[in-house]
Structure formats: structure tokens, C-alpha cells
């Protein structure tokens, strides 16, 4: 018995030291660690997904919509009537105008197309990044189709033409070529105020 007490007395300091050094991780800390990892993974996945589906296109569209003209409390796209893209790249400009007109005629068969233009001089180019790494390039052009909507007014439609490129590869057209981004119905009295 004395021997057992002696062993117990010698073991107590060792047990006390072990319990101080090896504190188990609390449930709160475990949950915080899991949460941080999950948040980081979701953020990375969100960035990758955003690049794939073109979230920056939505940001770009908001920037494009900043150029809207307000008339009588309503916001309209400018009505462009001068084609600047044709001066630089005639073949691409003609293709865009032709495709935009065809898509417009299919969507609005009763409207009478007056003209179609690509008002920018060249492609608008952006760099696609994943974090701090360049993963590709993207370029955009917009074609506008203006049509008479019976005696009531006009229609002004904006079509997006987008191409993406991986480094060292050729540009590839987006699956929606062209993509109808926006159509404004414009009353007769407002139309002259929108001409650019």
C-alpha cells in the first residue's frame, strides 16, 4: 500500500504537467477553423465561376448603363447613328451589323429597321485574372439596331459580341453571338433627344 501511494505521489506531478500542455481544442475553435476553410474555398470557387460565366460582364454592363440619358424621368440608351467600327475592321463590323439585324428582326418582326451601327472604333479589351494570375483575355463590341415601332415610337437594341482567348490561343466567340443585352422602347417625342 505504501508502495502504491509512493507511485501515486510520483505520478501526480507528471499528470498535472500533461493536462496543462495538451489542452483539447474547444468546439468553438474547431467550428471557427472549419468556417474559415469553407469561406476561403467558397470565395475561390466563386471567383472561378464568375470568370467562367462572365460576372465581370455584368459589372461592365452596369458601367455601360451609367451612360444612359434621362428624359422625362426615364433612362434610355443613346441612339447612335454613326458606325466607327466599319472604318477600322470592315469585315468584322459588317458581320456584327448583319447578325444584330437578323437577331433583331427575329425578335421584333413587326418593327421596321432604320439602321444598325457599331459606334466604337475598336474592340474593348480586358484582361481576365484569377487572383494574381492572368488566365486570358476578353474583348467586346456592341452593335445597336434602331427601328421604327409603327406610329408609336422607336426601338433601340444593344447587342453584345464577346470573344475570349486563353494565353497562346486564338479568340473564341461566346456561345451567345450576339447577345441581346437591352432594348429600349422610345416614344416619338423622346427620340430626337437621344441621338448621339
Language model: regions and residue ranges:
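Sec/Tat signal peptide C-region and signal peptidase I cleavage site
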Residues: 10-16
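Cystatin/cathelin-like cysteine-protease inhibitor module
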Residues: 18-196
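Intrinsic-disorder-linked linear interaction elements in eukaryotic regulatory proteins
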Residues: 5-9
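Cleavable N-terminal signal peptides
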Residues: 3-4, 14
Amino acid at each position: 500500500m505504501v508502495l502504491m501511494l509512493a507511485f501515486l505521489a510520483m505520478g501526480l506531478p507528471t499528470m498535472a504537467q500533461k493536462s496543462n500542455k495538451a489542452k483539447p481544442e474547444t468546439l468553438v475553435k474547431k467550428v471557427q477553423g472549419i468556417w474559415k476553410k469553407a469561406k476561403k474555398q467558397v470565395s475561390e470557387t466563386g471567383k472561378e465561376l464568375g470568370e467562367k460565366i462572365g460576372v465581370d460582364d455584368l459589372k461592365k454592363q452596369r458601367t455601360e448603363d451609367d451612360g444612359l440619358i434621362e428624359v422625362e424621368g426615364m433612362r434610355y440608351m443613346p441612339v447612335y447613328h454613326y458606325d466607327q467600327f466599319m472604318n477600322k475592321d470592315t469585315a468584322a463590323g459588317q458581320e456584327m451589323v448583319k447578325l444584330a439585324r437578323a437577331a433583331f428582326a427575329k425578335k421584333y418582326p413587326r418593327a421596321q429597321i432604320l439602321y444598325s451601327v457599331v459606334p466604337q472604333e475598336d474592340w474593348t479589351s480586358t484582361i481576365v485574372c484569377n487572383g494574381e494570375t492572368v488566365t486570358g483575355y476578353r474583348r467586346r463590341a456592341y452593335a445597336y439596331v434602331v427601328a421604327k415601332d409603327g406610329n408609336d415610337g422607336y426601338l433601340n437594341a444593344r447587342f453584345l459580341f464577346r470573344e475570349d482567348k486563353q494565353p497562346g490561343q486564338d479568340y473564341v466567340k461566346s456561345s451567345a453571338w450576339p447577345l441581346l443585352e437591352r432594348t429600349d422602347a422610345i416614344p416619338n417625342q423622346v427620340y430626337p433627344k437621344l441621338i448621339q
